[in-house]
Amino acid sequence: MNMLLAMLINITLSLLLISIAFWLPQLNIYTEKANPYDWGFDPMSSARLPFSMKFFLVAITFLLFDLEIALLLPIPWAIQIHSINTMMLTAFILVTILALGLAYEWIQKGLEWTE
């Protein structure tokens, strides 16, 4: 009963805040918000600024290796299970796939900034 009441309150409060944000938008543009800031970007222009594809590829590579760390971090605790061979084989396959991907990126010169 308590969980149902908490869910009902959360949903009601969320819907109330969403409807207030939808029906009461800020219609006037202040001069401070209309001026460019820091880097000189126009705040009223399109939000989709062009970016370097090489930067995107390096960022994706970083995320993949960050995911590798997140997947391999629990290995010391997983050693306590009975099927240690299966766990180590899975970790070895994961590291091998990521190393092959890194080698492929390196060979294709995807990690270099110069054109």
UniProtKB/Swiss-Prot annotation:
Catalytic reaction list: a ubiquinone + NADH + 5 H(+)(in) = a ubiquinol + NAD(+) + 4 H(+)(out)
Pfam families, per the entry: Oxidored_q4 (PF00507)
Membrane topology of the entry: Multi-pass membrane protein
EC number: 7.1.1.2
Primary localization class, coarse: mitochondrion
Enzyme's top EC category: translocase
Keywords from the UniProt entry: Electron transport, Membrane, Mitochondrion, Mitochondrion inner membrane, NAD, Respiratory chain, Translocase, Transmembrane, Transmembrane helix, Transport, Ubiquinone
A single cellular component GO annotation: mitochondrial inner membrane
Molecular function terms from GO: NADH dehydrogenase (ubiquinone) activity
An example Gene Ontology biological process: mitochondrial electron transport, NADH to ubiquinone
Transmembrane intervals: 4-24, 55-75, 87-107
Entry keyword Hydrolase: no
Iron-sulfur is among the record's keywords: no
Location of this chain's protein in the cell: Mitochondrion inner membrane
Function: Core subunit of the mitochondrial membrane respiratory chain NADH dehydrogenase (Complex I) which catalyzes electron transfer from NADH through the respiratory chain, using ubiquinone as an electron acceptor. Essential for the catalytic activity of complex I.
Subunit composition and interactions: Core subunit of respiratory chain NADH dehydrogenase (Complex I) which is composed of 45 different subunits. Interacts with TMEM186. Interacts with TMEM242.
Sequence similarity: Belongs to the complex I subunit 3 family.
Protein name: NADH-ubiquinone oxidoreductase chain 3
UniProt organism field: Neotoma floridana (Eastern woodrat)
